[in-house]
Amino acid sequence: MKITVIGAGSWGTALALHFSQHGNRVSLWTRNADQVRQMQEARENKRGLPGFSFPETLEVCADLAEALKDSGLVLIVTSVAGLRSSAELLKQYGAGHLPVLAACKGFEQDTGLLTFQVLKEVLPDNKKIGVLSGPSFAQELAKQLPCAVVLASENQEWIEELVPQLNTTVMRLYGSTDVIGVAVGGSVKNVMAIATGLSDGLEYGLNARAALVTRGLAEITRLASAMGAQPKTMMGLAGIGDLILTCTGALSRNRRVGLGLAEGKELHQVLVEIGHVSEGVSTIEEVFNTACKYQIDMPITQTLLQLIRKEMTPQQVVERLMERSARFE
């Protein structure tokens, strides 16, 4: 199958590498013309994922029309902020009918829409829209280390066809029709990872980390259920699986945000040092707004938002959470 990957960050590049190494032709496209030239010349993404050479089956395209030609699937792997404009480009290039998966995680700012909802709004006639989510770091996938992720869509028949087509010995795919649950789990875990990094950076220990991960899962489950998801989805790869990896993994950008804030650094400085998008930061406010809309209590999210707004110190965030009134779990 010909697969088009839009977005050449670390995750987009890792997916392009993976699928091109497992029987697919892949076209990788990004808006950044300088980055396209660099990748074409070096046959490597030295900016987004250095150290991994591109196989012959991976084509880097400067022309989106060429990248979309004969494609059977489009993966949009931009930041969430770039998702809508990428979907608009599909329409503009006459490719709005192609099957499309959002492989980014978060809520769209201002609208509060999940990624698949953005795609449905831009491409209302497309019946093959879904998300790819689950516990997976780009570096490990590029090294061909095993992982398991979820493909979710409201279109069950399509997912049943797509999963065996994309399944490999390195990336085990599971299908789901609970696209809300999969999308919410992948989005809100980024917020919880910042909180866990904050606690670890303050050296509050493993007990505190376990408490944050567990209560974070409770917050995610409450919100997802209120939005129409199946609670059991939060017990799977897109829920607790992604949460554990992002909260504890050394490669987690969102965890690194929390660690940086615990050192007393300004948020801007932390993000510059990381050098990549941290969706958790841009997601916090939309998650909190959505929780308010559904009247869901999300104390970890709320206190983190106050930290980002400089209304609290890192120490006060943890103190506030521990001072909450006693209750049954």
UniProtKB/Swiss-Prot annotation:
According to its UniProt record, which residues of this chain constitute the active site? K189
- Mind telling me which GO cellular component terms the entry cites? cytosol
From the UniProt record, give the pathway where this protein acts: Membrane lipid metabolism; glycerophospholipid metabolism
The enzyme's main class, written as a single word, is oxidoreductase
Disulfide partners:
none
InterPro entries, from UniProt? 6-PGluconate_DH-like_C_sf, 6PGD_dom2, G3P_DH_NAD-dep, G3P_DH_NAD-dep_C, G3P_DH_NAD-dep_N, NAD(P)-bd_dom_sf
Q: Pfam families, per this entry? A: NAD_Gly3P_dh_C, NAD_Gly3P_dh_N
| Molecular function GO terms recorded | glycerol-3-phosphate dehydrogenase [NAD(P)+] activity; NAD binding
Q: Which UniProt keywords apply?
A: Cytoplasm, Lipid biosynthesis, Lipid metabolism, NAD, NADP, Nucleotide-binding, Oxidoreductase, Phospholipid biosynthesis, Phospholipid metabolism
Question: Which residues are sn-glycerol 3-phosphate-binding?
Answer: K105, G134, S136, K189, D242, S252, R253, N254
Q: Where does NADPH bind?
A: S10, W11, R31, K105, A138, R253, V277, E279
Q: Which reaction does it catalyse?
A: sn-glycerol 3-phosphate + NAD(+) = dihydroxyacetone phosphate + NADH + H(+); sn-glycerol 3-phosphate + NADP(+) = dihydroxyacetone phosphate + NADPH + H(+)
- Location in the cell: Cytoplasm
Q: Which Gene3D superfamilies match?
A: N-(1-d-carboxylethyl)-l-norvaline Dehydrogenase, domain 2, NAD(P)-binding Rossmann-like Domain
> In Gene Ontology terms, what is a biological process of this protein?
glycerol-3-phosphate catabolic process
Family stated for the protein in its record: Belongs to the NAD-dependent glycerol-3-phosphate dehydrogenase family.
The record, for HAMAP family, names: NAD_Glyc3P_dehydrog
Q: What does this protein do?
A: Catalyzes the reduction of the glycolytic intermediate dihydroxyacetone phosphate (DHAP) to sn-glycerol 3-phosphate (G3P), the key precursor for phospholipid synthesis.
This protein's name: Glycerol-3-phosphate dehydrogenase [NAD(P)+]
What is the originating organism of this protein? Answer: Neisseria gonorrhoeae (strain ATCC 700825 / FA 1090)
